[in-house]
Amino acid sequence: MSYIEKLGDNMVKRLKILIDNEFSNLIIEFKRNVKKSFEGEAFVTIGIDENDKISYISIEPLDKDLKEGIKRIKVL
C-alpha cells in the first residue's frame, strides 16, 4: 500500500502539484490555510519514474530557519 493510499482519497483531493515551465518552479500545494512559511537554501533531489512522473522529492535544508521549519511539520 502506498503512502497516498494510506492517507485516503480525501488527502489526494487536497494535494495539487504545479509545474511552472517558464521559471522551472515545482509547487506542491495542500488545500490548507497558511499560518507561517519558511524559506532558505537547500539541496533538493527529485526522483522520477520511467514515465517522468515524480517518485520522490528530498529536501536537505542548508539554512537554519528552513531546517527548524521542516522539523515542525506534522505529516498527518
UniProtKB/Swiss-Prot annotation:
This is Uncharacterized protein 76. It comes from the Viruses.
